[in-house]
């Protein structure tokens, strides 16, 4: 059975939930009270959540670029952030 695509509301809720979980992980890691193995597991989960969030934000930015484009047929070019 194929997976259904998540609705924009579900994606937003998932993004917010992931961000909240990531903030909690950072707080636990910053406390310095976790045993090493647990801290490594938390760090790994945090990296996963950060990557997912980054991808979600990139997709949202691309959608905004498409919506603001004057030319409907203009190709979407990959986003390249300015690095300073």
Curated annotation (Swiss-Prot):
What Gene Ontology cellular-component terms does the record carry? Answer: cytosol; exodeoxyribonuclease VII complex
Q: Which UniProt keywords are present, listed alphabetically? A: Cytoplasm, Exonuclease, Hydrolase, Nuclease
Would you say which domain of life the source belongs to? Bacteria
The entry's localization annotation reads: Cytoplasm
The UniProt entry, under Gene3D superfamilies, shows:
Exonuclease VII, small subunit
Q: What is its EC number?
A: 3.1.11.6
What the protein does comes down to: Bidirectionally degrades single-stranded DNA into large acid-insoluble oligonucleotides, which are then degraded further into small acid-soluble oligonucleotides.
Similarity comment:
Belongs to the XseB family.
Name of protein: Exodeoxyribonuclease 7 small subunit
Question: What species is given as this protein's source?
Answer: Yersinia enterocolitica serotype O:8 / biotype 1B (strain NCTC 13174 / 8081)
